[in-house]
From Swiss-Prot:
The gene is pdhB. It comes from Geobacillus stearothermophilus (Bacillus stearothermophilus). It comes from the Bacteria. CDD domains: TPP_PYR_E1-PDHc-beta_like. This is Pyruvate dehydrogenase E1 component subunit beta. Its cofactor is thiamine diphosphate.
């Protein structure tokens, strides 16, 4: 075991897969010589060569098209979109092509592409560097969308994503890259895509979250415990497909739930989770399922970021509303 930050765990996963499979290729803006803007690919070009880890022009649409072509030729591309706010430039490649080629060809061709991309707020970056746009891609059939909250999860899920024969969007929260360390196995291991994780056991209310909001939820749960409220925290880890079994099992146990996301409230992952709970566990509920989310505005300037982003206080307030219903 080694103490790793999330970005170190990601680099470790990439190194393992480059060693394991000669068809794995890593490319994107600045990922080669400079090792990525956040150094997630640092040292990989020197170790594996310019044919395996290489830089691209500043053109997300080109990165997406290259990934599709390489996948059709039998490679296992791992492109990086430098910030997920720039995903608009490559949406046709992702949703119009990658997600559909297996279906269009009757399963004759696969798209073993893992798109890595930093996202999320809390580090005072401009809006296109901070947006949480996971809802855009989670809606598209044929894609898997993974959002880890810990170094351990990041490494195991990234290895699983690279080995998957379908396209995976692997989103890495900026705030979590170096915010803490965790013991991570030094060898290879996998975590199943589509499997949530109960990060804290509880009996009174279920708090469902993903990404950086898992840590806000855990902080809220610790505060709620002081007031006699036992909160269970479920980390989705994968937002498409959802782990319905774990979600419903927890809600049926506690009878109450809130869903927490960093993204804007409208048409988000949280709304989808709430709908699934209402459709499958309505008779187990003691109160309505509520959401914690950002306002439905464009991501603000850095000066207003702290009041715009959801935090543990919002989680506590919403949990108490449900408990007092």
């Amino acid at each position: 075991m080694a103490q790793m930050t999330m970005v170190q765990a990601i680099t470790d996963a990439l190194r393992i897969e480059l060693k394991n499979d000669p068809n794995v290729l890593i490319f994107g803006e600045d990922v080669g010589v400079n090792g990525g803007v956040f150094r997630a690919t640092e040292g990989l070009q020197a170790e594996f060569g310019e044919d395996r880890v290489f830089d691209t022009p500043l053109a997300e649409s080109g990165i997406g098209g290259l990934a599709i072509g390489l996948a059709l030729q039998g490679f296992r591309p791992v492109p990086e979109i430098q910030f997920f706010g720039f995903v608009y430039e490559v949406m046709d490649s992702i949703c119009g092509q990658m997600a559909r080629i297996r279906y269009r060809t009757g399963g004759r061709y696969h798209m073993p592409i893992t798109i890595r991309s930093p996202f999320g707020g809390g580090v005072h970056t401009p809006e296109l560097h901070s947006d949480s746009l996971e809802g855009l891609v989670a809606q598209q059939p044929g894609l898997k969308v993974v959002i880890p909250s810990t170094p351990y999860d990041a490494k195991g899920l990234l290895i699983s994503a690279i080995r998957d024969n379908d396209p995976v969007i692997f989103l890495e929260h900026l705030k979590l890259y170096r915010s803490f360390r965790q013991e991570v196995p030094e060898g290879e291991y996998t975590i199943p895509i589509g499997k949530a994780d109960i990060k804290r056991e509880g009996k009174d209310i279920t708090i469902i979250a993903y990404g950086a909001m898992v840590h806000e939820s855990l902080k809220a749960a610790a505060e709620l415990e002081k007031e006699g409220i036992s909160a269970e925290v479920v980390d989705l880890r994968t937002v498409q497909p959802l782990d319905i079994e774990t979600i419903i099992g927890s809600v049926e146990k506690t009878g109450r739930a809130i869903v927490v996301q960093e993204a804007q409230r409208q048409a988000g992952i949280a709304a989808n989770v709430v709908a699934e709970i209402n459709e499958r566990a309505i008779l187990s509920l003691e109160a309505p399922v509520l959401r914690v989310a950002a306002p439905d505005t464009v991501y603000p300037f850095a000066q207003a970021e702290s009041v715009w982003l959801p935090n543990f206080k919002d989680v506590i307030e919403t949990a108490k509303k449900v408990m007092n219903f």
